[in-house]
Amino acid sequence: MREFKFIKMNGLGNDFVIIDQRKNTISLSKKDIVSICDRDDGVGCDQLINILPRQDDGNILIEFFNSDGEEIHACGNGSRCVADILMTEENVNSIKLSTKEKTISCQKIGDNCVSIDMGIPNFELKEIPVKTDIDLNSLNFQINNQVLANPFFVNVGNPHVIFF
């Protein structure tokens, strides 16, 4: 793998390696992405994000890859980091990012503070990509001596398990 420049950022505890590929493109294999994301031998991050050239609609295209090298459709915290870079660079207070599935509207609401609209979340379990069959009734977590039960799955571009 050849050398390349990147930015490492974090948003609410998630960290990202962000590669600006608008002018100079590099091809990264799944193995390369896993190596970059590796916390012991690589840079270390939750996700790798590519910033790609502006599309015909004026939006900047971005790609997200989890640390296992799998591509996902969106990440809220990662989108906020990319939006902050681009809005600072372009000296604007709003920008639209495009992923392969959606448009993400981003707005600067203060110094180093970005708000995004990721669209309507999907709560349909059958439409959320999970790798195994899951019995929601038996899925409980214990945190600080408190049991969290009755989770919901939601997809906003990347599947999440949430508790209300």
Task: Name each model-derived stretch.
Residues 1-112, 161-164:
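A glycine-rich beta-to-alpha transition motif near the start of alpha/beta enzyme domains, typified by
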Residues 2, 91, 98-164:
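ATP-dependent small-molecule kinase catalytic core of the GHMP/sugar-kinase superfamily
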